[in-house]
Amino acid sequence: MSDHTLTLANGLNLGYAEYGDPRGEVAFYFHGWPSSRIQGSLFDDMAKKHCMRLICPDRPGIGLSDFQPGRTLFDWPETLTQLANHVGADNYHVIGWSGGGPYVLITALKLPKRLLSASIICGAPPLKFLGDREMFWLYRVMIQLRHYLPTVLGAVLRLGGLIAKGSPQKVPLRWLMKLLGQEDRRILNLPGIYEVVRDAALGALDRGPRSVIADADIYLNEWGFEISQINFPIHFWHGKQDRNIAWSYTERLASLIPAATSVLSDIDGHYSLPVTHAEQIIVAALQKSPSTGDAGQQDGNTGIDGELLGAVLRRQSR
């Protein structure tokens, strides 16, 4: 990993890390919540193997990036444009995991002519899509704290950071791991995987909970656009054992976007899908999307090799 900082036109610093092949096709990776640029290291090996230059910015207030008061999703395309120009990328891929998903969507809406492909892994949907029964209980609690006891939410996030520093094999983290599905627990217990997820989350908390809460507010507020306004094809990936974000949201999002594809795994969860299938996700992205000029007439021809998609998630249940 190599860390860098860019001073934006508004005078704020934007931090980012680079992974993969420095001479490869440029892809921007948008991290989840709470997370940071460090999360992109999970894709480093496969990005190198397939000649992808993976650039992972910290969102404002996270990690190396300065806090930006009052920002919305609509601020992101301009930030990304300045970063892309800085690294010399006229055209590029975008990939977002979990909380990075909405940033892929706004990029596809506002910057389609610069995109080569757009991929969302276990992506967060608009809040209006979420029903109480479908929402992860921890998110429900945090939303209530944000509305009624914001200072308590800050304390909860600090406590979460302290707990995360422990071992997933020991209490209390071992208890919390039981909230996840079997495959997610297996993946997070592999050497080095939990440490990356943990360090990425702690990187988000480096400057205190204010920035993490402000980042969450983006998801809680109205996004300011309808999903159906997006004409650029999105490649969606989701695991049916995801207990953080239900796979049904991905199906709903995909149904609203012309020529979108959705690849679902019966046995994967929120963490196991991107870690286990990083290579397939990157290969599919590099095959690029079809022209958006007649995206509504693609009739399922998405530009992703059908044999690849058919084989991606054919693992046997353990």
Language model features by range: what are they?
Residues 138-225:
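Alpha/beta-hydrolase
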Residues 12-64:
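Conserved HGGG/HGGXW glycine-rich cap/lid loop of the alpha/beta-hydrolase fold
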Residues 75-93:
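Conserved acidic catalytic loop of the alpha/beta-hydrolase fold
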Residues 91-133:
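Conserved hydrolase catalytic core segment
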Residues 230, 236-238, 242:
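Short beta-strand/loop motif that positions the catalytic acidic residue
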Residues 259-318:
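Catalytic active-site module of serine/aspartate enzymes centered on a nucleophile-bearing elbow/loop
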Residues 243-249:
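Conserved alpha/beta-hydrolase "acid-adjacent" motif
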Residues 58-63, 68, 124, 268-269:
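Short beta-to-alpha linker loops that shape the active-site pocket of alpha/beta-hydrolase fold enzymes
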